[in-house]
Amino acid sequence: TSNMAMPFALSIAVSTVIIEVLLGVMLLIGFKRKFTVWALLLMIVFFTFLTFYSAYFNKVTDCGCFGDAIPLTPWQSFSKDIVLLVMILILLVNIKVIKPLFSDKINSIIVGIALLLCIFMGYWVLNHLPLKDFRAYSSGTNIPKGMEIPEDAPKSVVEMIFVYNVNGTNTEFTDKQLMDIPAGAAFVSREDKVITQGYVPQIHDFSIEKDGFDYTEEMLSEPKLMMLISYDLALANKNGLAMLEKLHQEAKVKGYKVIGMTASADEEISAVKKEFKLSFDYYFCDATTLKTIERANPSIIILNNGVIGQKVHYNDINKLKL
């Protein structure tokens, strides 16, 4: 069922955000108060359940409510939803107090303008870079510096957990309980459980690898480096890929070292290079990290000695300044 819904995930996400914004605007101007408050109540009940489920069962490690602008843990997000639920219930009880600020005609125009702005913003962020980048790889970021861990930084405390099948039930044992494992129990797996999270640098899981070798330090020392990023080449925009070789040749003339960055397998890389006649080499990096750098697929990043200078969506390649 989840796989069937995947093609619609982006549309559902964008639509949900637009609905939330419109309901917020409608509440502020007192437009269609009964519909607005009841819709807000239904929405917050759903999200309160969702955030509790995510937090309790540890389905996600951070909340996407405000993205990287205001990072929240799942439990913080659940607490936020509880507060909003209480506030909306207060609005429901006092719904008659809500009065429209303007006439229905003017209120309708305001909501219509808000809808158009939401649609425009949705279109913009899907076809260009965000107007404001709150992520760890925004322009001006020094990647090597962002990866540094201070000497006095707190270390993570990790406990080894051994899972054994005991009489048909998977049972966890710590390394101090190994002597208590019953005879005949079958080993299932070993896991590392984080007891206390240590210092996590702003930039982590970033690497540039090829054929088992790590080229991160070497590449981040390049005075003029162009990275052509596609977290998944199978999902990359064909028109975007078709522009890369011309850009590669133009950048080489200007003295840039040009590399591709992807999490795709070698077979996929070879097929794409052959189809689009790409002559630069692809290096491996974690897919989540590449999506954090830039979700456009492909996207272009310019670095100068490890400092991000320019970032462009494939639709804006002509705006790149070499």
Model-derived features: positions:
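Interfacial helix-start motif at the membrane-water boundary
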Residues: 2-19, 75-79
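Functionalized membrane-embedded alpha-helices
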Residues: 9-50, 91
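Short loop/turn motifs at secondary-structure junctions and domain boundaries
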Residues: 10, 154, 198, 290-294
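Membrane-interface helix-boundary motifs at transmembrane edges
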Residues: 29-38, 96-107
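Membrane-embedded alpha-helical segments of integral membrane proteins
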Residues: 45-98
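Internal/C-terminal transmembrane anchor helices
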Residues: 102-131
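Membrane-interface segments at or immediately adjacent to transmembrane helices
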Residues: 121-216
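Solvent-exposed soluble domains appended to multi-pass membrane proteins
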Residues: 209, 216-322
